[in-house]
Amino acid sequence: MKRHFFLSASILSVSLALLLIPNCGKHRETVKTDMEVAADLVQTLNEVPGLSIKSEPGNMIVEPSEKNRYLITLKDPAIDLDISKLNLGIPVKNAKISIKIKEIVFKHDPREKYLELVSIRELLLEWDLTGFLSTALQAKGKQGLQGITIKISMGKADFKNYDISPLLDAKTKDLMELVGDFLERNQSHETAAEHITYDLGFLSKEHKKISIVLDIEKMQTRQNALSDVLISLYKKGRELPDLSKVLVQGKALLDLAMSSSAVKLSVKENENLLGSGTIDHTAFSYFFKPDETNSFFIYGFKWNMENLKLSVPNNKEIELAGNIEQMGMKFSLENLSAPFIKSYFDLVKKSHEMSASMDKEKLHQEQMTMGLTIASEFIKSKPAVKFSISPFKHHFGELQVEVNFQFLNLMAPPVGKAVVHIPAVNKILTKIAGEKSLSDKTREGLLKLAKQYVPVDENGNGTVTFETRQDQPGTFFLNGKPIK
């Protein structure tokens, strides 16, 4: 019996030793409750300059997520943003923005200092810009404005890969540093939003209340960025990467795409409707990337829209002008060399740094010197401007536009052509002649312009050509003839 007792006691002693020895000399980690994690997050966000968030414990919901992270939901938080607390480079007063949100969801890992914005429900932002703009304009010696307000509301928004971790360590950072941190964290992210409204109000010179309201049923955005290049514009001490190597890699520095559906715009004066418009669908993309040969950079945008309709009660001619079934527009600035882009980025970076120091005279001198470098590299690049509209389907007919000009030197206009193709010209002119909504003056003016400047071929198609030539600088040609 004694032997059995001592054996059991020995086993128990060894077991306790194995449990206790690894923890000797260590402090026991405090495990926080879910609600304490949420409260700590709110407290940390309140340390962001200008940001104030209040949320009652009963309105906080904490759920487990993947990778031992938390899903933290704040219901009906009270949020205020004071722009005057941000380092904008100008003195700002009365710049508080009130933000109401029904629900905001974060994904959070306090150990990794990670914070992601997941979704927002029922947002309302209200801002009286009068004080902000007046102060900003007065700093530039201009007269202030009155009665300027903006309201932004949104039914919901869902975010994918939107990392806002820089807010967890923003207490001592200025705006430019935060922008750089956000760019570094968000090389690629997506947003899907519904029921968005932008309401801009202001007083006209005659003290009439003007209201411009933009409603968007659905909107999606996608952004991809090569952060190493863009971050260097905002972060102090961060050098630009070798842009020649960036060209060889063939990766876009910035690629932004946005699409919207059921877009409505209305303009009112003293609550009386001046005009409105609708677009069934629109898509916009903005890019800055290497060309197909990886030899030069291209900067530009694309814009497509379907079914634009305007309603202007007191001007039927504007309604007709805005009756567009379909339009596709492209613009690009091409042949941009790596040295030119570097000189431009150097100027942007220097402007950011000098703006923060408020040494305006020194900034101006630096800009003048760097501007000469930019001009020199610009001409060495021999950049080309390209613009096109196709398709363009209007109430009266169709047309296509092609523009291609190249800068060869600073002392002469760019060389190239702008061509407008108009199929079935006579059919369009017949429709214009019979349009009762047009005034006699407008109708006769359009018919006269077409007859005078639109040559028509044997197939009934018209072509208008404007050009400049390298061998005749300073002379402009319309349809092959010099313009006198």
PLM region descriptions:
Residues 10-19:
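Bacterial N-terminal signal peptides
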Residues 1-4:
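Positively charged n-region of N-terminal signal peptides that target proteins for export
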Residues 25-484:
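Glycine-rich, small/hydroxylated-residue low-complexity segments
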Residues 21-23:
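C-terminal motif of bacterial Sec signal peptides marking the signal peptidase cleavage site
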